[in-house]
Design a protein with these regions (language model features):
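Sec-dependent N-terminal signal peptides
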Residues: 4-13
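Subset of outer-membrane beta-barrel
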Residues: 17-340
C-alpha cells in the first residue's frame, strides 16, 4: 500500500503547485530555464521520455528513483554546444551503499561567451565585458523499498548570474518508480524544481538619478537601484510508462512515453525507443513536445556504445544524441561514462 500512497501524494502535491490553464500558457514567466534542458544524452535521444526508465546515473535528472539500478558505481560527463553559442556541461556520480540506498552528486552549468557592455550613450561598448552563467549543484538519494518499488529525491542549490547581478535558491525533486506485474511494465512519476522564487540582485542594478531636474540647488544625484521581480522556478510534473517489446539475451527493444505538466507552458507528450544489441550497441529515437503549440523541438536520434574492459567488470559508455530545433537548427550532445 505504501507505493500507492507515495504515488498519490506525488500527484496531489504536483497539481496543487502547478497553476495552469488551457488558454494561458504562461510561457516566459519562470526563472532558471537551464533546469529544463535534458541532462543526459541517452534520455535526450529518446525524445526526453525517460521518467519510467530504470537508467542508473542517467535517471538522476529525469526521475531520481531510477538510480536504484546502479550496481556499484557510475559516473558520467556530458558536453553540449547549446543554441546561440551557449555551452552546457553536466557531470554526475552515483554510489551504491547496499542496504542504505544510493547516493549521487551532480553539477550542471550553462555559460555564454563574453560580450561588450553597451549603453545608450556608448552603443559600441564601454570597454567592459559581461557574461552569464547558470549553475546547479545537486545531492541525490534513492532507495528500493521493495523489489518492485523505488523512491528518490534530489536537493539542489541553484544560481544564476549576469554581469554584476545574481540570484540563488534551493530546490528539490521527488520521484517514484514502480515495476508492474504486467510484463514488467514500469510506471514512473517525478516532480522537479520545487523551491523558492529567484530574484536578481547586484551592483549592476544601481544607478544615479536627479529627482528634480527642473530645479537648481537641490540634491543633484541620488543613488538608486532598479527593483526586480521574483520569478518562480520551472516546476515540472512528469508521469511515464516504459517497457520492453523485445527482451532476449541478444536483442532488446524498449519503449517509453512521458506526459508532462509544467507551470510555465501547456502540457505535452514525449515518446522514445531504444534498441540494444548484445547490450553493447544502441540505437535510439524519439519525438519530443508532441501536441505543444509553437514548439521548435521534435525529432531526436542517438546511438551508444557500452564496452567492457577485458578481465574486469568496468564498462565504458559513450552516448551521442541529436535533437532537431527547427529555426534554431539542432543540438548535439556527447557523453562519456564509466560504471562497474
Amino acid at each position: 500500500m505504501r507505493k500507492y500512497f507515495f504515488i498519490t501524494l506525488l500527484f496531489s502535491l504536483s497539481y496543487s503547485q502547478l497553476d495552469n490553464t488551457e488558454t494561458i500558457s504562461k510561457t516566459g514567466t519562470t526563472s532558471a530555464q537551464f533546469l529544463k534542458i535534458g541532462a543526459d544524452a541517452r534520455g535526450s535521444s529518446m525524445g526526453n521520455a525517460f521518467t519510467a526508465m530504470s537508467g542508473g546515473i542517467s535517471s538522476m535528472y529525469w526521475n531520481p528513483a531510477g538510480m536504484t539500478s546502479i550496481r556499484k558505481f557510475e559516473a558520467v560527463f556530458l558536453n553540449s554546444d547549446w543554441i546561440a553559442g551557449i555551452t552546457y556541461n553536466y557531470t554526475a556520480v552515483g554510489l551504491n551503499l547496499g542496504q542504505a540506498g544510493i547516493i549521487g552528486l551532480s553539477m550542471t552549468s550553462l555559460s555564454t561567451p563574453e560580450d561588450l557592455v553597451r549603453t545608450v550613450e556608448k552603443p559600441n561598448g564601454t570597454g567592459e565585458y559581461f557574461d552569464a552563467n547558470d549553475l546547479a549543484l545537486n545531492l541525490s538519494y534513492a532507495r528500493r523499498l521493495t523489489n518492485k518499488f523505488s523512491l528518490g529525491a534530489n536537493v539542489k542549490y541553484i544560481s544564476q548570474s549576469i554581469w554584476q547581478s545574481n540570484a540563488n535558491t534551493i530546490a528539490a525533486d521527488l520521484g517514484a518508480l514502480f515495476v508492474t506485474p504486467f510484463n514488467n511494465i514500469r510506471l514512473g512519476a517525478s516532480l522537479s524544481n520545487y523551491g523558492a522564487d529567484m530574484q536578481m540582485l547586484g551592483r549592476s542594478q544601481k544607478f544615479s538619478v536627479d529627482p528634480d531636474p527642473n530645479n537648481q540647488g537641490n540634491v543633484e544625484f541620488v543613488n538608486a537601484m532598479y527593483e526586480t521581480d521574483k520569478f518562480p522556478l520551472p516546476l515540472i510534473f512528469r508521469v511515464g510508462l516504459s517497457g520492453e517489446i523485445i527482451n532476449s539475451d541478444k536483442n532488446r527493444l524498449s519503449f517509453a512515453i512521458d506526459a508532462l505538466h509544467p507551470n510555465d507552458n501547456l502540457e505535452w507528450v514525449n515518446i522514445g525507443m531504444e534498441y540494444a544489441a548484445m547490450n553493447m550497441f544502441f540505437l535510439r529515437t524519439g519525438m519530443s513536445t508532441l501536441f505543444r503549440e509553437d514548439t521548435e523541438e521534435g525529432l531526436t536520434l542517438g546511438t551508444g556504445l557500452n564496452y567492457r574492459l577485458a578481465g574486469t567488470s568496468t564498462q565504458i559508455k559513450l552516448d551521442y544524441s541529436y535533437a532537431a530545433f527547427g529555426r534554431l537548427k539542432n543540438v548535439q550532445r556527447l557523453s562519456i561514462g564509466v560504471h562497474f
